Amino acid sequence: MKALWAVLLVTLLAGCLAEGEPEVTDQLEWQSSQPWEQALNRFWDYLRWVQTLSDQVQEELQSSQVTQELTVLMEDTMTEVKAYKKELEEQLGPVAEETRARLAKEVQAAQARLGADMEDLRNRLGQYRNEVHTMLGQSTEEIRARLSTHLRKMRKRLMRDAEDLQKRLAVYKAGAREGAERGVSALRERLGPLVEQGRQRTANLGAGAAQPLRDRAQAFGDRIRGRLEEVGNQARDRLEEVREHMEEVRSKMEEQTQQIRLQAEIFQARLKGWFEPIVEDMHRQWANLMEKIQASVATNPIISTPMPQENQ
């Protein structure tokens, strides 16, 4: 909280010094680190170009192009300021409601002054365009001189507004940072005793309940060990039964295989006994038939009959 009041005091002193000095430097005295500052610098550069009142500036002033460009730059700046303010509001955290309201009111006032002066500048440029249009064919030097003077004054006002807004936002940011740090400290203070109580309770429970837990773990381990041994014995017995059964099956299969082999040999011998006489008898009959054919051919040779010749 001391840091916040220190920033407020510096801001007030800076404001007093600013009121005592009518002249303002031509450049904004900060680094454009935030988007709203970058948008304001773009507006500032364009205004510096308008203030030259060159022939191109006067031509664009008469065509309303300058006021349109300024409108876009104004809207961009105000949009970025609102976005940055909203971001800081989300970071304020547990800051007192009174402090939050006061800081928000100060930033809102500075923001409103900057927006109003920007609007005044745009209206003055529109008024200049209307005055020039009503004086067609006449000298407009006096109008340009008045506009130049007004632009210098408006530039100083806008610069003061911008610097004041930047300082108010800096205070707002400091309040957000302090609120966050204070919130963390308060949370640490609230949770510290609870954490210590929990640690002490855990230590007490560990000291008092360690032995019962060990006894229960030992008993549980013994039960598990006994159950595992029982299951192992049952598995071994079952495996032995399966092995004996498989041995019995193998013996039966070998016996049946031997019986089938013997039966096949007997059947083969029977088939051989059945078919061998038949085959031998067929061989004899075939041999006799061949002998008869050969004898018949030898005794009755075939006489070749001459082929009839064709008429010549």
Curated annotation (Swiss-Prot):
Its main location: secreted. Pfam families: Apolipoprotein. It is found in: Secreted; Secreted, Extracellular space; Secreted, Extracellular space, Extracellular matrix; Extracellular vesicle. One of its GO terms (biological process) is vasodilation. Residues 202-282 are annotated as: Lipid-binding and lipoprotein association. Residues 150-160 are annotated as: LDL and other lipoprotein receptors binding. GO terms for cellular component: chylomicron remnant; endoplasmic reticulum; extracellular exosome; extracellular matrix; glutamatergic synapse; Golgi apparatus; high-density lipoprotein particle; intermediate-density lipoprotein particle. The keyword Secreted applies. It comes from the Eukaryota. Residues 258-312 are annotated as: Homooligomerization. The keyword Phosphoprotein applies. The modification Methionine sulfoxide is found at M135. GO terms for molecular function: amyloid-beta binding; antioxidant activity; cholesterol transfer activity; enzyme binding; heparan sulfate proteoglycan binding; heparin binding; lipoprotein particle binding; low-density lipoprotein particle receptor binding. Sequence repeats lie at residues 72-93, 94-115, 116-137, 138-159, 160-181, 182-203, 204-225, 226-247. Keywords: Chylomicron, Endosome, Extracellular matrix, Glycoprotein, HDL, Heparin-binding, Lipid transport, Lipid-binding, Oxidation, Phosphoprotein, Repeat, Secreted, Signal, Transport, VLDL. Residues 1-18 form the signal peptide. Belongs to the apolipoprotein A1/A4/E family. Homotetramer. May interact with ABCA1; functionally associated with ABCA1 in the biogenesis of HDLs. May interact with APP/A4 amyloid-beta peptide; the interaction is extremely stable in vitro but its physiological significance is unclear. May interact with MAPT. May interact with MAP2. In the cerebrospinal fluid, interacts with secreted SORL1. Interacts with PMEL; this allows the loading of PMEL luminal fragment on ILVs to induce fibril nucleation. This is Apolipoprotein E. The gene is Apoe.
